[in-house]
């Protein structure tokens, strides 16, 4: 995970490349190595905020960003649990992102569907993966129940990634 070789990472980047627009601002939840937010910036995002529950992810993501010529003026990484930390939740609720990305696991994505409407603009794109195909219907149902319309599902080797649009 986080190196670009795992199916979920490749599927997410494929969807980001298709659905993100140049100049979009991005929130990467569960950023790990930073690969999705860094790819988004390299593909033309104007700014990316990234968060991960593992404090080690901050230095790793900043190191990887630097290796790709991305500075802290366009990239911000913090450590915390966006599902449990009220202060972190408030910080991201104060912004509205064009694109929200999460490559985690189905259960966390389902939990995030309750929070993401606070972070995403109307018409914004949510790209999610880390979903085994057996859990895809559960994720799609959670998205639909929270005001997301399905744009596209891509699959590879038992994994799925979803692009959906927030319609409020």
Enumerate the language-model features and the residues they cover.
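Conserved SAM/SAH cofactor-binding pocket of Class I
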Residues: 3-82
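S-adenosylmethionine
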Residues: 53-167
